[in-house]
């Protein structure tokens, strides 16, 4: 067993999963629904979302057609979710695009279209969800991320830059609201390379990764604020030389938490 403790309040609440038409987002929506969570599944393909809803346990997945890159449409979509299902208590920012284009051949407008979804969508959805969460002082946000900012590959400048900015945003949100709303817990999760359209055939099955992601998303603990998990374990922060020496003298060392 891992360290994650599932929050009953989150289980009984309303979760929003973006990019839920296929791949990891679909698997996360189905995993949460299987655990009893009411899920608003956001995506651009209405037919695809309806297929996801048809697969879900107990009719708990509700399709919401939305392009998160259309930032102005996001508040209205979240208002509709609140009216129909109830206030959002959990948001998983998963939606992303990964166009493979050489920067010298790419139109800057296409570059910024990638940023609009991968970063702008996270900003808009997080803001809309937080407007509801601050009313009760409770909530959970999980941002799906990658190491693309530190290990970019060729022909992926837009993806790498936007996902890297998303990583900074996670920490910036905690810095901005963490002291005022400590029970709105914001974390980052890197599921690794998956066997999805954006991943590689030899990658991890999305359903396996989604089991970890759902557990992390439903784990509500103040100590998770600003923390990063990779696959099924916590990524420990680098320690200074002084910290390492003190830990050695005290015969203790940090232990990564597991999902």
Stretch-by-stretch model annotation:
Residues 102-103, 110-112:
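Substrate-binding pocket helix/loop in short-chain dehydrogenase/reductase
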Residues 47, 65-76, 108:
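The beta1-alpha1 cofactor-binding region of Rossmann-like NAD(H)/NADP(H)-dependent oxidoreductases
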Residues 35-51:
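Conserved glycine-rich Rossmann-like NAD(P)H-binding loop of the short-chain dehydrogenase/reductase
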Residues 21-22:
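Conserved glycine-rich cofactor-binding loop
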Residues 146:
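Residue(s) in the substrate-gating loop at a strand-loop-helix junction
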Residues 126, 162:
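Active-site helix of classical SDR
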Residues 180, 184, 188-189, 196, ...:
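C-terminal helical subdomain
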């Amino acid at each position: 067993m891992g360290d994650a403790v599932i929050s009953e309040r989150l289980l009984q609440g309303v979760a929003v999963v973006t990019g839920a038409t296929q791949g990891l987002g679909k698997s996360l929506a189905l995993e949460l629904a299987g655990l009893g969570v009411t899920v608003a599944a956001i995506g651009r393909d209405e037919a695809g979302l309806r297929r996801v809803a048809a697969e879900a346990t107990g009719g708990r997945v509700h399709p919401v057609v939305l392009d998160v890159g259309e930032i102005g449409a996001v508040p209205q979509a979240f208002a509709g979710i609140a009216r129909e299902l109830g206030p959002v208590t959990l948001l998983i920012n998963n939606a992303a695009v990964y166009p493979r284009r050489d920067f010298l051949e790419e139109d800057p407008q296409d570059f910024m279209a990638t940023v609009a979804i991968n970063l702008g969508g996270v900003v808009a959805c997080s803001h809309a969800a937080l407007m509801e969460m601050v009313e009760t002082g409770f909530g959970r946000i999980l941002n799906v991320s990658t190491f693309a900012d530190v290990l970019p590959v060729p022909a992926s400048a837009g993806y790498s830059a936007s996902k890297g900015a998303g990583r900074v945003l996670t920490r910036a949100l905690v810095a901005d609201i963490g002291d005022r709303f400590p029970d709105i817990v914001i974390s980052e999760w890197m599921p690794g390379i998956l066997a999805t359209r954006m991943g590689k055939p030899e990658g991890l099955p999305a359903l396996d990764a989604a089991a970890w992601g759902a557990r992390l998303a439903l784990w509500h603990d103040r100590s998770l604020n600003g923390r990063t998990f990779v696959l099924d374990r916590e990524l420990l922060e680098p320690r200074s030389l002084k910290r390492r020496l003190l830990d050695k003298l005290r015969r203790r060392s940090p232990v990564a938490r597991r999902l």
